[in-house]
Amino acid sequence: MPATSMHQEDKQSANGLNLSPLERIKIEKHYGGGATLAFISNQHDELAQVLSRADILKIASYDCAAQALQAVLDCGPMLGKRGFSRADIVRIAGNGGGAQALYSVLDVEPTLGKRGFSQVDVVKIAGGGAQALHTVLEIGPTLGERGFSRGDIVTIAGNNGGAQALQAVLELEPTLRERGFNQADIVKIAGNGGGAQALQAVLDVEPALGKRGFSRVDIAKIAGGGAQALQAVLGLEPTLRKRGFHPTDIIKIAGNNGGAQALQAVLDLELMLRERGFSQADIVKMASNIGGAQALQAVLNLEPALCERGFSQPDIVKMAGNSGGAQALQAVLDLELAFRERGFSQADIVKMASNIGGAQALQAVLELEPALHERGFSQANIVKMAGNSGGAQALQAVLDLELVFRERGFSQPEIVEMAGNIGGAQALHTVLDLELAFRERGVRQADIVKIVGNNGGAQALQAVFELEPTLRERGFNQATIVKIAANGGGAQALYSVLDVEPTLDKRGFSRVDIVKIAGGGAQALHTAFELEPTLRKRGFNPTDIVKIAGNKGGAQALQAVLELEPALRERGFNQATIVKMAGNAGGAQALYSVLDVEPALRERGFSQPEIVKIAGNIGGAQALHTVLELEPTLHKRGFNPTDIVKIAGNSGGAQALQAVLELEPAFRERGFGQPDIVKMASNIGGAQALQAVLELEPALRERGFSQPDIVEMAGNIGGAQALQAVLELEPAFRERGFSQSDIVKIAGNIGGAQALQAVLELEPTLRESDFRQADIVNIAGNDGSTQALKAVIEHGPRLRQRGFNRASIVKIAGNSGGAQALQAVLKHGPTLDERGFNLTNIVKIAGNGGGAQALKAVIEHGPTLQQRGFNLTDIVEMAGKGGGAQALKAVLEHGPTLRQRGFNLIDIVEMASNTGGAQALKTVLEHGPTLRQRDLSLIDIVEIASNGGAQALKAVLKYGPVLMQAGRSNEEIVHVAARRGGAGRIRKMVALLLERQ
């Protein structure tokens, strides 16, 4: 059984599994549990040859598990010969009816293989049991004739009751089509446990729900909670509406297993939760998961005790707001003191508890942490691996497999990255099974880590292994295949690319577009395929469609755009703003919420651009509703609309606003000003950053960090992790001679925590290559610096051979996107050299944020610009600033019109040769005529655009008349605006005038 045999390090001792009391109870409570324990005891040696301890426990946690374990021993060798990995076999066996499923896989897999189903498909279908496998064999061809793809059939079949769901689709699909449900909707409804009943219930209740304003998309989502959920919405929706819950909330709560019970619990418990200070958003979050009803009850029971231990309400909401939230809260209460004794912070405990299986993860950390520490894993690593669904299994797998990974050349950070996602345990096993074969195909270790380092990484790796040759034949290169696979649901996306790529290609979508849409998953590809003709008729171009589809929930976002676009147009939203709001994860919900709350926000003084900014991020729907709820209180506390928009207008904006409301008094007591609070809250993860500052600030102060230092480190994406990393790693940095300002510079960027870790790891190697400490800090002190440091080590020697010195390499690497810039220099340097650009030119172009894109733009547009009279110096000047690529494109696009309006080449170069040059040119094009009517000369406009930029031009346009009425001359206005920060200077002039009046 070569594919499933264990490595020597993985084998269990012959003394048995040494089950803990908790593990024994977990097995015994299942039907046939006693027989399972006896089987494990009697057959331990045989099982240990093919399964790890974690595998045995997984299979044993179901009814009749003894038969499933016996089936593994019987079928495992043959399945191994057919190419099934150990993880596949465990997955098939680890369900109710696992024994029959294994025997059926042996029976039907050859036929399914001939019909185009992959091994990944077979494993997934087997999750619906033996009957599902046989039903796919029987009615799969008919469903195929009706237009259902192989991926659709697998999705429907691979759940409890999959066989019945397939039969129901066959029977009910024509009627559902008549009612306006498309193929994607039908697959979504059927593709859950109890899918057959859900399809029937949709037919029964859809007319009534439709009359109440629920869309087809809404009904399909509610059906994810099963037939009962649909009936519950019908019964309870009027009362919930009276209590202030809007349709989006109701859909969210109902659309999960147990959705009916969750809706009832919200109705029963909402008033008590409100009395305790929980907001409507909190209640919705806790209720909107499997077991939501139990979670709400547990919060009511346990919240006082958790608050006494120092957990905040946001912490409690976060821990309760996942499947199994009730158990997680109880586990935190039981185990928190033991964690504190071992040095885990409150933030660590919350992170580990706040996932599916959080209770088991906490238990596993307590049990395995000493052994992991002995192997060199830090507390931060342990928290990262445990802090995902399936964290307990991931920790056990790391302990079992780490030595083998080390022998194969994987570093500790790579092991942590692969293990630190949903399904991390399976990912590690799959890498061990397939890594050698990938190496033979030329796939780099970094690519393997990238593919596996996402939710569902094991399946993605398996799919790449199987489909890569076919994708290569279609023209996809290794980089694009890795990119498609390296997202949650990567396996399904790869299969869908094969299905729909030929047609999308004919419709004008490029390979790059298809890869981007695949970032929204398989469903996004199929929905783009289905809706693109209609969206085109409405004026949306392929770029718009790609932007909307290429995110989580992209399929739903496309549907929502189709449904809501007319209503949004009536409200004054244009196509660009609709695309912006829809073009993020959760875009569909954002559009619905804009329609819902926009009038109320307008009454409160929020402009359309501000509403778009709040809505146009991940979680935009929640952010809009939270602004509506909290704005009056925040306003009373001195936060103005600009502050609120800034905080809310990021992914996680709703949570950030909630955190500001709760934590602001404590910050004020510690001397933080309002701008400090806004800066820390106004990033992705702002809520966590605020919490981390309150928790860690005293310790950081003791180490000599000032309040501005703390704000700078916390005020970026990942600020909470950066502060934690500074606290943990600062002594090591001090020992190596880094100053406090060095540490702050490295930590004070996106990904600061990873940058600190990378510096400690890579600094010795960089020193050997003659890079100084100042160089290392310079490279590390930017967004994306971890990759930049690694790229310097990887590409530095070749760049040196081509004549680039140390200072040049540091300049190129020491900007946002430095890693990509170094790679671009290697790739495009020879071509640029042939075209007359010297090394100094190349360094200037590449040595800015977005340097890689600038180099590509020079290659692409340089010849045309030269034909239009621009020389090499002009091109270097325009490309060699942040946003250089956009500047070159803008010159190419707008140059002829600007020439017609009297601007010469020197003017255009001057305006384009600054950060934001593209925007400056567009603004001159748009507003230049108006400014000319106000007696500003071409020279004035060029002066303002090339120094103050687009914002300064707009400020002059807006406030110029006011200033002129007050007696200020054009000459004075131009003098103030034509400087860096000119827009702010103009606004200050106006403010001073108003104060005097």
Swiss-Prot record:
Family of this protein: Belongs to the transcription activator-like effector (TALE) family. Bat subfamily.
PROSITE patterns: ANK_REP_REGION (PS50297)
Intervals holding Cryptic repeat repeats: 51-83
Biotechnology and industry use: By combining the DNA-binding domain with the catalytic domain of the restriction endonuclease FokI, TALE-nuclease (TALEN, or BuDN) enzymes able to target specific dsDNA sequences can be created that enable eukaryotic genome modification. Other potential uses as transcriptional repressors, for transposon targeting, DNA methylation or histone tail modifictions are also possible.
Ranges where the record places region BuD domain: 84-967
Cryptic repeat + repeats: 968-997
Keyword DNA-binding found: yes
Cryptic repeat - repeat extents: 19-50
Gene Ontology MF: a single term: double-stranded DNA binding
Name assigned to this protein: Burkholderia TALE-like protein 2
Lineage: Bacteria, Pseudomonadati, Pseudomonadota, Betaproteobacteria, Burkholderiales
Renumbered ranges of Core repeat repeats: 84-116, 117-147, 148-180, 181-213, 214-244, 245-277, 278-310, 311-343, 344-376, 377-409, 410-442, 443-475, 476-508, 509-539, 540-572, 573-605, 606-638, 639-671, 672-704, 705-737, 738-770, 771-803, 804-836, 837-869, 870-902, 903-935, 936-967
